[in-house]
């Protein structure tokens, strides 16, 4: 009997040690709620620093925009120059083809002019034939005029190697030195472009005899 009593006492002591003690709380005492602390940033953002950062970003974007715009303007200018150059080259090529074709026609005009100067048709039939090919010559000249082809007026003009081809040079009493005194073959131009140089005879000025004769004709100092 005494053994059972001691065992019961030990069990009660163990149970009492396992259960934590609960403090006495009065019914009227309020219990403080548990408040969780919110973590805060160690450093707050400074408005001035943020404004400076935005200004730097804006300046960077402006520089990028200016660089892209400058590149675009260069490309646009290069393309415009390329387009103009292509148009100019095409126009030059077209003008060269037209001038080349017109130059091939000029010998035909020369033949018509030689025939008109050398032939003296006699008889009604010959005159009718003469009028017929002269009509063709007039049509050909009119076509050349419509294409802007014009004859050069060279006699009495100063010799210009860009317009004239000097075939002969001789002394001439009527023209000074380096003046065209005779046209041997007509020259033609079109819109400032030479189709064919004029073959000319250029004056070398009065000869030495003419100069001495002119000097002898002047009154001497003793003559009066």
Swiss-Prot record:
Keywords: Chaperone, Cytoplasm, Stress response. Residues 1-16, 209-224 have a biased composition (Polar residues). GO terms for cellular component: cytoplasm. One of its GO terms (biological process) is protein folding. Gene3D superfamilies: 3.90.20.20, Head domain of nucleotide exchange factor GrpE (2.30.22.10). SUPFAM superfamilies: Coiled-coil domain of nucleotide exchange factor GrpE, Head domain of nucleotide exchange factor GrpE. Pfam families: GrpE (PF01025). Belongs to the GrpE family. PANTHER family: GRPE PROTEIN, GRPE PROTEIN HOMOLOG, MITOCHONDRIAL. Homodimer. Participates actively in the response to hyperosmotic and heat shock by preventing the aggregation of stress-denatured proteins, in association with DnaK and GrpE. It is the nucleotide exchange factor for DnaK and may function as a thermosensor. Unfolded proteins bind initially to DnaJ; upon interaction with the DnaJ-bound protein, DnaK hydrolyzes its bound ATP, resulting in the formation of a stable complex. GrpE releases ADP from DnaK; ATP binding to DnaK triggers the release of the substrate protein, thus completing the reaction cycle. NCBIfam families: PRK14140.1 (NF010738), PRK14143.1 (NF010741). This is Protein GrpE. It comes from Synechococcus sp. (strain CC9902).
């Amino acid at each position: 009997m005494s053994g059972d009593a001691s065992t019961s006492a030990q069990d009660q002591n163990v149970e009492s040690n396992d259960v934590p003690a609960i403090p006495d709380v009065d019914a009227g005492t309020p219990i403080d709620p548990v408040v969780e602390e919110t973590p805060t940033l160690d450093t707050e953002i400074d408005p001035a620093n943020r404004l400076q950062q935005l200004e730097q970003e804006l300046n960077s974007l402006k520089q990028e925009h200016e660089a892209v715009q400058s590149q675009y303007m260069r490309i646009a200018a290069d393309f415009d120059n390329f387009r103009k150059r292509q148009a100019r080259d095409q126009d030059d090529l077209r003008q060269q083809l037209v001038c080349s074709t017109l130059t091939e026609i000029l010998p035909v005009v020369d033949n018509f002019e030689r025939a008109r100067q050398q032939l003296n048709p006699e008889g009604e039939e010959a005159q009718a034939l003469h009028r017929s090919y002269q009509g063709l010559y007039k049509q050909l000249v009119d076509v050349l005029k419509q294409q802007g082809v014009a004859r050069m007026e060279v006699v009495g003009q100063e010799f210009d190697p860009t317009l004239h081809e000097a075939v002969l040079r001789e002394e001439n009493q009527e023209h000074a030195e380096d003046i065209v005194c005779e046209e041997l073959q007509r020259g033609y131009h079109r819109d400032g472009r030479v189709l064919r140089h004029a073959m000319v005879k250029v004056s070398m000025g009065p000869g030495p005899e003419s100069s001495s004769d002119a000097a002898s004709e002047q009154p001497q100092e003793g003559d009066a």
